[in-house]
C-alpha cells in the first residue's frame, strides 16, 4: 500500500493545531500526568497530542514510534517516528517555539520527513534526493563566513571553548525547530552533546538538513543514523558545511 505522506503529515498537523493551541501558555498544558517510556515526565499537552497522533496513524497499519507510548508494532514495512509536540516546555510556558515532527522509514531507510512549526504555521518537508521545502519553496543551508556562524549549542559543561569560535550561540528548546532553521539557513548548526537526543526529536530534521545541503553526524563526525526506537538517547551535530563540522570536532578534541 502506498501513502500520501505529505497529505497525512499536514492533515495531522492541522488537527493537532486545532486541538492543542487553545492550551498554549496555560497551567493545564504543563500538568504532569505520568511518565513516558524513557522515564521522563509526560505533560498533559503531550498526552493530548499523542492521543491524536495514535488515532490517526495506527489505523493506517504502520508501525509507530512515539515519545510517550513507545513503539506500536503493526508488522508493517513502514515505521513512523513521531514527536507530536517537540518543545512542550516552551508550549506550556507560552514561548512560541515548538513543532510537530514526523519521519517515515521503509525498513530502516528514510523516505519522508515533515516538521510543522505551529507559530507561524510553517510546513517543512523533505524526500531523499528531492530536496527540502518550506511551504512549497525550496530551501538551502546558509554559507556563513568563518567565525560568523550562529550555532545552537546544548551542553552540560563540555566543549565550552566552542563558544569563542562562533559569533552567536542560541538555545531554543526545540531541536526539531532548530534543525528546520539549519535547513532554511536561519541557523548554521545545532550541536547537542548531553546524550539526550531521541530519534523522535530528530527523525524528520535529519533528512531535512541533509536534503537542504547540510551535514549531520554523531559527536565523532560519523554519519548520524536515526534508530527506530523511542528510548535511545544520543548526541548530534547538524551543520551547514564541513568547515563548521571540523571546527566543532576540533573544539571537542581540545576539551580537557
Swiss-Prot record:
Example GO molecular function: fructose 1,6-bisphosphate 1-phosphatase activity
Keyword Magnesium: yes
Cofactor: Mg(2+)
Species: Thermococcus kodakarensis (strain ATCC BAA-918 / JCM 12380 / KOD1) (Pyrococcus kodakaraensis (strain KOD1))
Name recorded for this polypeptide: Fructose-1,6-bisphosphatase/inositol-1-monophosphatase
Function: Phosphatase with broad specificity; it can dephosphorylate fructose 1,6-bisphosphate (FBP) and inositol-1-phosphate (IMP). However, while possessing a high FBPase activity in vitro, does not participate in gluconeogenesis in vivo.
Quaternary organization: Homodimer.
Sites where the protein binds Mg(2+) 2: 83, 86, 201
Misc: Is not able to complement the defect of the fbp deletion under gluconeogenic conditions, probably due to insufficient transcription.
PROSITE patterns the UniProt entry points to: IMP_1 (PS00629)
PANTHER family in the cross-refs: INOSITOL MONOPHOSPHATASE (PTHR20854), INOSITOL-1-MONOPHOSPHATASE-RELATED (PTHR20854:SF4)
Transmembrane parts of this sequence: none
Catalytic activity: beta-D-fructose 1,6-bisphosphate + H2O = beta-D-fructose 6-phosphate + phosphate; a myo-inositol phosphate + H2O = myo-inositol + phosphate
E.C. number: 3.1.3.11, 3.1.3.25
Amino acid at each position: 500500500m502506498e501513502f500520501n505522506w505529505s497529505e497525512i503529515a499536514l492533515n495531522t498537523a492541522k488537527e493537532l493545531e486545532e486541538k492543542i493551541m487553545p492550551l498554549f501558555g496555560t497551567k493545564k498544558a504543563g500538568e504532569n500526568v505520568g511518565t513516558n517510556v524513557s522515564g521522563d515526565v509526560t505533560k498533559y499537552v503531550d498526552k493530548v497530542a499523542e492521543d491524536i497522533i495514535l488515532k490517526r496513524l495506527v489505523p493506517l497499519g504502520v508501525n509507530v514510534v512515539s515519545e510517550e507510548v513507545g513503539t506500536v508494532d503493526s508488522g508493517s514495512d513502514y515505521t513512523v517516528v513521531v514527536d507530536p509536540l517537540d518543545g512542550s516546555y516552551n508550549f506550556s510556558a507560552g514561548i512560541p517555539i515548538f513543532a510537530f515532527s514526523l519521519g517515515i522509514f521503509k525498513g530502516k531507510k528514510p523516505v519522508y520527513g515533515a516538521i510543522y512549526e505551529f507559530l507561524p504555521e510553517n510546513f517543512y518537508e523533505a524526500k531523499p534526493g528531492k530536496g527540502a521545502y518550506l511551504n512549497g519553496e525550496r530551501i538551502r543551508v546558509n554559507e556563513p563566513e568563518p567565525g560568523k556562524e550562529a550555532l545552537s549549542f546544548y551542553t552540560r559543561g563540555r566543549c565550552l571553548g566552542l563558544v569563542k569560535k562562533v559569533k552567536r550561540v542560541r538555545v531554543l528548546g526545540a531541536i526539531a525547530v532548530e534543525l528546520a532553521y539549519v535547513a532554511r539557513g536561519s541557523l548554521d548548526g545545532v550541536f547537542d552533546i548531553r546524550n539526550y537526543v531521541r530519534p523522535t526529536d530528530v527523525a524528520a530534521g535529519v533528512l531535512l538538513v541533509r536534503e537542504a545541503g547540510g551535514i549531520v553526524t554523531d559527536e565523532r563526525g560519523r554519519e548520524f543514523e536515526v534508530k527506530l526506537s523511542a528510548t535511545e538517547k544520543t548526541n548530534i551535530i547538524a551543520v551547514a558545511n564541513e568547515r563548521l563540522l571540523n571546527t566543532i570536532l576540533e573544539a571537542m578534541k581540545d576539551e580537557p
